[in-house]
Each structure stands twice: as C-alpha cells, then as structure tokens.
C-alpha cells in the first residue's frame, strides 16, 4: 500500500473560534493542521514543525502578522514556505503592506473557502483536495 504525504498547514490566528473553524475546514479538506495564537507562537511553530504552507492573520497581540512574516522570510529555515495573509482589513494599502512584508497572497475575511483551497493547492502543487461538505 502506497502512503500519501499529507500537506502540513500552519494557521496563525488569535481569535479561537475563527482558528478552530478554519482548522476544521482545512482538516476536512485533507490537510494536517497546526495552529498558533499569535505571531510569536507562529514563528516558533513554523521553525519547529516546518509546515508546507502558512496562513497568517495580520492583526494579533504580542506580534502582528506583518512582523512574523518578515521574521519568517529572514530565516533560511522558513524563508521559502508559502505564506497566505488573511485579514479583516480589505484596503489596498494593507494588502500591499502584507505583500511587501513577504506574504505570497492576501485574503480578506470572510474567506471564500473554495478560492482559498484552490490557492493553497496551487502553492502546494496539488491538483485537487476534498472540499468540505456544506451543512
């Protein structure tokens, strides 16, 4: 029997309900998910777990996503991990700031899950992933 590698996604989000719902949706889509509640934990988790992709909220306590992304990009062990910024901020200025910090993509909350999964798969070079069933 052939083992299929499961892609690892780190989701960094300070709101517990949003973090839990998104983590569950990603797991139902076939990913292995780890979570962190702020930028400090996110940087530590990324270094320890070596995820295939990071979803990063931008507005968090202790260390915001902008700073966490800059740190991850400056560390050779995490510099090449794709990072998708997720924020309630919809302005072009915040999107530009996230991309300048080193994010590969920027999504505005509420996130369109099917579009997010397509984007994740593009970065992970996976043609398809299970879509969670709507309730």
Model-predicted segments: where are they?
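Active-site beta3 strand of CheY-like receiver
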Residues: 49-55
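Conserved acidic carboxylate
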Residues: 13
């Amino acid at each position: 029997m052939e083992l299929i590698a499961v892609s690892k996604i780190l989701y960094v989000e300070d709101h517990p309900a949003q973090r839990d719902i998104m983590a569950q949706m990603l797991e139902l889509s076939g990913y292995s998910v780890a979570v962190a509640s702020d930028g400090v934990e996110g940087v530590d988790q990324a270094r320890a777990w070596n995820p295939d992709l990071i979803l990063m909220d931008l507005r968090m306590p202790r260390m915001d996503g902008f700073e966490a992304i800059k740190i991850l990009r400056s560390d050779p062990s995490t510099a090449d991990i794709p990072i998708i910024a997720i924020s309630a901020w919809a302005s072009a200025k915040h999107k530009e700031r996230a991309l300048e910090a080193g994010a590969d993509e920027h999504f505005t909350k509420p996130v369109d899950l099917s579009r997010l999964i397509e984007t994740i798969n593009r970065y992970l070079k996976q043609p398809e992933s299970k879509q969670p069933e709507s309730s």
